[in-house]
């Protein structure tokens, strides 16, 4: 039998050539005399005699419209022969029966949908009313390709899909976490253990998302034999939300923060309806706030707003930049930098956006009603209603305003934004507040704000003067009113605030410059100033490529006093990594360090080693060492750091972040996924160990994994890493796309085959063989091969022990059981028994 294998392969090659020829002709009649077949009458050529012919029946196919998949997974599509009309009517090819639900996924305009009619008892779409639509099935590849003129489709671009293509995902549960632990020992004998955590738990059902944010910590210290322990845990908020694509808005119920572009943010319990710029094409969207600073050691950075933790992570020593905050965050943020020696520095960042401009004819709005909430879940104050809106009056002008109505507290704001063209964009507004406090007088005051933004294209620079704000002594925000009424706290009444951001690139010098400055004055306490300035340059010298020099300075608060820091870093490529020198100054102390940093494992692992001298400040010099390591595994993002200061302290810290996602389609542990955000559950057909998303995600033993770097409402592309696939695994559908609504658990299925490649001889119960050209499919409906001369079939992706189906004349005729001990390099004689 082995001697006949080359001949069998030639027969299969002949069939492939015939099928290719059929694609170029409308109809073909075959001369079977050229084939060396034992029974030339037992040949099923129906699938080759017409171009695009598909045997009637059901197929599992991926529907591709203009190169883009329309569904999370392959769809079960029936091929139906159209009914004959008249005695002499020509028999038509079986047609793909696309249901109305499938058609709605294609992104057709409303006018185009009206032109689609249905046949076969209203089950199958007919696109003859849309000229230019071309449907081409390829059952071997498991694909149904549809080419459609763009005129029939809604607007889309390379990064955005229309709302009709947005996916609310599948039902499921999630748990996201972020853990940080530090153990430190003081030279004088004291030691401390600190552990903090925060995250989100939630569940999805249809378009609705239920979320609960949590945070907690435990601190234990021992000094002079005395042990103290502090523990705390809180559910910081509970809320329910969903997207309303038709209104380009989000509906939120429960505990939330008012993220206003006009009024100061405050917490509340109630309901809100807010337009969401993320539902617009990317070029029309807003921005996300960025936070920069300097860490003197491997430090923990905590970003919070009104006590709720938004970001908590470890950063290595030196300048840091946090850019992955949610774009919906508005208002003043509190930033705390916790050094390894326990020292804490604080500063604030105002996330005021660029001038409030809206495209002509569009309206952006926010409507909120409820009761104000303190740091816990208790509500306080009267029921309030607030709203704000911006209307694009023309290409140059936008009008905006808002109001807060709460009985004893009311505020009204009005303003305008002006696109000056070449000079930039400008906006100005005024807010009037009236606050009546029981038993005291009424406070009335105004607050003026001026904002400016300009992009200098020729100079490759941005400047944002996002505020000058002046507030009268008796002006009150809602938060200040609540503090005065319920806590008799009239302190920290703002007077003037300046915020300036400047970014400048000098391409000829490979130099970048960044400045962030904020100044806040008060009526009753001393002013505060915060700034961060940095200059970075890259150049080549003495044959070394990519030498970098960076200089930065910043101001923060330490023990209620201003703390100025400066940092210098010089880095030189060395081997696969980077050698560096850094010098820093803070509180009259100077630190000089030499170090080495490297990444490996395709960027999934990195480490840094540093050693140096700490001197100045009237204290003796101290040697200092620290090391930092991070690893991104498929299950979690992990990092560890260690530091030691001579006659000072020794500390060790670890952190981990990740989550668990559980759905009816599968479950997996995963890295990333903070705050219950959008994610994509990928399914590799039950095949484990498949690398996805550049190897950052590897499917588990059940063939599922979770991709968390998914942007809501964007067109996201996720692919199998073909270079890292195991030898016995083949991906026939290796790229999927998704456009998920906020908080969705998306689901996409890759077509992955794992198994052997076999030569099999198929025999029917009477000793005959299936006809030449019969199709062999797996239990999942995937075509694995076709029958050639004498029942010989070359099959790929066969799993030992599975049952295969053999199809001809438009239906399953018999089934084949593959032995558990199938061997690839042998021919197998397999009986094909009638379907049960």
UniProtKB/Swiss-Prot annotation:
One biological process GO term for this chain? pilus assembly
How does the UniProt record describe the way this protein sits in the membrane? Answer: Multi-pass membrane protein
Here the disulfide bonds are 814-832
Pfam families from the UniProt entry: PapC_C (PF13953), PapC_N (PF13954), Usher (PF00577)
Q: Which GO terms describe its cellular component?
A: cell outer membrane
Keywords, alphabetical? Cell outer membrane, Disulfide bond, Fimbrium biogenesis, Membrane, Signal, Transmembrane, Transmembrane beta strand, Transport
Would you indicate the residue range of the signal peptide?
A: 1-24
Organism domain of life: Bacteria
Q: Where in the cell is it found?
A: Cell outer membrane
Q: Name one GO molecular function term.
A: identical protein binding
Q: Enumerate the InterPro entries for this protein.
A: Fimb_usher, Fimbrial_membr_usher_CS, FimD_plug_dom, PapC-like_C, PapC-like_C_sf, PapC_N, PapC_N_sf
Say which family it is in: Belongs to the fimbrial export usher family.
Q: What does this protein do?
A: Involved in the export and assembly of pili subunits across the outer membrane. Forms a hexameric ring-shaped pore in the outer bacterial membrane. The 2 nanometer-diameter pore allows the passage of the thin tip fibrillum. As for the rod, it probably unwinds into linear fibers which would therefore be narrow enough to pass through the pore.
* Protein name (record): Outer membrane usher protein PapC
Which gene codes for it?
Answer: papC
